[in-house]
């Protein structure tokens, strides 16, 4: 037989929604927007690293970081 604990009582509401699925696509579009924004962020970082995106007064030489 399982024993009731205070932590179990606190976490029980989180588990009460187990197995329930929202109808339709739900919030999939929100996830798609955030994935798109993250992709753009990574693309900008890659372009700065490759010096394809030139920014004024920003030197990407890693040797300058040791000074």
Curated annotation (Swiss-Prot):
One Pfam annotation, family name?
PsbH
Q: Which InterPro entries match?
A: PSII_PsbH, PSII_PsbH_sf
Q: Where in the cell is the protein located?
A: Cellular thylakoid membrane
Instruction: Give TM regions.
Output: 29-49
Determine if Ribosomal protein is one of this entry's keywords.
no
Question: A GO molecular function for this record?
Answer: phosphate ion binding
**Keywords attached to this entry:** Membrane, Photosynthesis, Photosystem II, Thylakoid, Transmembrane, Transmembrane helix
Q: Which domain of life is it from?
A: Bacteria
Biological function: One of the components of the core complex of photosystem II (PSII), required for its stability and/or assembly. PSII is a light-driven water:plastoquinone oxidoreductase that uses light energy to abstract electrons from H(2)O, generating O(2) and a proton gradient subsequently used for ATP formation. It consists of a core antenna complex that captures photons, and an electron transfer chain that converts photonic excitation into a charge separation.
Q: What is this protein called?
A: Photosystem II reaction center protein H
